[in-house]
Amino acid sequence: WNNLEAIYREKVARATDENELEEDISIAKEFPYSKMATLGWVPPTRKAEEKVWNLRGFFEVARLGLLEILRIPGIAYRKVGENSKSNYALAAWAQKARLDSRTILTSPVNIDKLSSVLSDIRALTLEDPESFCPKLRQLLGECGIAIVFLPHISGSFLHGATFIEGNHIVIGLTVR
């Protein structure tokens, strides 16, 4: 009897996994996967199941169905349009900003220091982007802010976003 119970439980688990995979395949179709693969965010593939596994890893979830709320809690963003696909593109872009921000070393958040370096930051805008970006990253990093520059994903209508990740503030900007 125990053997029959084990076989039954295994079949139920497989059926559940197959149903979840089918649900995740339909969700994966909404993401701009080919653009994400072109940018190197996920491995390129044409197989739906591989896309699901790659997106699960990218979003750090066991099932894509868990991404019902596509936004990072507390995210503030600037975008100039909206459609159903734009939310998925925004979620992918914001997740990449989150992942990249984890590799940036920052001091603890210090708003007073930020206030004191704002004039220096404004002065950097007069310089060439190649020279001011490293300086800007350093100044903001000393204030507990990680700045991430990411390419624009078509359909996201996104210019930038800010959110808190761990113990630092993240500013993500699109590069157009």
Model segments located where?
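Short amphipathic recognition helices of helix-turn-helix/homeodomain-type DNA-binding modules
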Residues: 1-41
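Residues within well-ordered alpha helices
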Residues: 35, 55-58, 139
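Residues at alpha-helix termini
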Residues: 39, 59-62, 143
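Extended, domain-scale alpha-helical bundle/helix-rich regions
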Residues: 44, 50-69, 73-76
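Alpha-helix boundary/N-cap detector
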Residues: 46, 50, 109-112
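Conserved binding/catalytic microenvironments
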Residues: 72-176
